[in-house]
Amino acid sequence: MIGDTVFDCVVIDEATQAPDPLLLVPLARGKVSVLAGDPNQLGPVVTGGPTVEATLASTIFDRLVTDSVMLEQQHRMHVDIMTFPSRAMYGGRLVAAPEVAAHVLADLGVRPDPARGKALWLIDTAGKDWLEQRTDFDPGGSLNNAPAFSFDPSTFNSGNAERVAAEARRLLSRGLPPTDLAIIAAYSAQARHLRELLRAERAAGLEIGTVDGFQGREKEAVIVDLVRSNDSGEIGFLANTRRMNVALTRAKRFLLVVADSATLGDHPFYAQFFQYVDEVDAHGSAWSDDAAPLE
């Protein structure tokens, strides 16, 4: 459609997600090119075997990042939500713009919840015995909306899902519009399970998905379900801190994380996260209440 047009300037957003062949086309059409993206968030989605993935996993943006400018002021997150990603991923350099540094749900007319009184809140499920399961073998087809005996390898956690659904209903009972809330599940099977539990809320505008679907997006409030809970400390691709950085930076005014510190706590990234929520006294236990809606 643009023929042989060459533009004075080409701006490519989310450039860290673009593999080289995709970037070469716009780069060839600009006298000057500006690449914008975050190398600490999701890279390109590449399929086709180990050789193809290894070839395309490193992007032009990654190779140019040493000659870049970091935008240190962010205009999305409350400072309590921002501080951990800033420390863990950006060397503590992020700064909250004055207009967002202290904004909270109450500014939107949402009733306060004294039991979750901070902009960031952790519900720790350690010791609840809400153990994860795999969907490799799903005899009822109940989690993936597929025929019985379907093969759909992913991880889900029914205990977590029930708690996350309760937390979502509690938030909505305070007057938060469903369109202002998102639930991000670490695994696709868990997202499907949550969609089943929250059908009515989804019909009203609540969004439920995985990390990949929320790159570059934001919501006033976000619940993140990290799903994994086992006796061996296995965390799978939760060890990919770039993915977790995306999940933890989508919320503007309120972020609630549901996680098992006993399973995740040996990984340095999560150990630092649990230390931070303890430092700011922003945590509760799944043992303490059932997250009933507020009257």
Predicted regions mapped to residue ranges:
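Conserved helicase motor core of SF1/SF2 NTP-dependent helicases
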Residues: 1-295
